[in-house]
Amino acid sequence: MTIRIAINGFGRIGRNVLRALYESGRQTQMRVVAINELAAAEGMAHLLQYDTCHGRFAWSVRQQDDWLWIGDDRIRLLHRPQIADLPWEALQVDVVLECSGVYGSRADGEAHLLAGAGKVLFSHPGGHDLDATVVYGVNQESLLAEHRIVSNASCTTNCIIPVIKLLDDAFAIESGAVTTIHSSMNDQQVIDAYHPDLRRTRAASHSIIPVDTKLAAGIARVLPQFRDRFEAISVRVPTLNVTAIDLSVSVRTPVRVEQVNHLLQKAASTAFHGIVDYTELPLVSTDFNHDPHSAIVDGTQTRVSGRHLIKTLVWCDNEWGFANRMLDTTLAMARAVSNAS
């Protein structure tokens, strides 16, 4: 049975989810029946078709009034500011992909359910009272049929947690620290302008800008054994897309660089195939643009100090990789229902 999807919020993640659905060939498994976005329909169609990061969409795109066609597939366009006014019941929506970045509480999820949706998947971390937080490849098998309000965590959480789990299973992590080197985002300024965070008042293209991150809390939410054992900081850098994560962990088992790289390279071709990739090529951030993996380990940058301190560099396309995981988790939510019946 084809899963009927609605996308609420057609920004960076919403558009990339729709593009990824077609580029991955999964539109027979999932069908987008509606998109709710306050912007004009003409702009929605234009930005879907032409993207500075990811290039021109390979599928034909046509828009007329409040309808969008991708090839022969027709999608209804809505422009409603209140969740309660969305016609999810009439459209028989199975899963709402909540990509607005505005909503993240259980009450917000329940509003979608009251509007008639079967389930809700947030494209960002939500409150502790959600039914589940999923990092695909690590804990999607814990999804139950009764889990109706789910978070897909964050792009950086999806990037680093598979690597942390692999290192912990093999070498027993005691503690860790993470530095996220993240591309500029749309909550920053093109030129100096007001923002509640004084660092984000500054022009994104001219500075490396430290910002707050809840990544350590996100790690603990999915891997609770690491509560109070990880710290994280984040800086935004003046690039358009792709993020690097510097991960340092202290482990109980004495290790060497070769052992760490062997572990991660093997996982990329076996248990974490399609989620984690591994490279030893002399690549830079732009080379990972449009990469669908959650994490790409750069084996040339692995270091071990004193046999017990491991440092790794992990890349991710913070848009495209995460968009693909949104689709994976949507299918996992549907499988949980199917397995229970």
Curated annotation (Swiss-Prot):
Keywords: Cytoplasm, NAD, Oxidoreductase, Pyridoxine biosynthesis. Its main location: cytoplasm. One of its GO terms (molecular function) is erythrose-4-phosphate dehydrogenase activity. The keyword Secreted does not apply. It is found in: Cytoplasm. Its EC number is 1.2.1.72. Catalyzes the NAD-dependent conversion of D-erythrose 4-phosphate to 4-phosphoerythronate. Homotetramer. This is D-erythrose-4-phosphate dehydrogenase. The lineage of its organism: Bacteria, Pseudomonadati, Pseudomonadota, Gammaproteobacteria, Enterobacterales. The gene is epd.
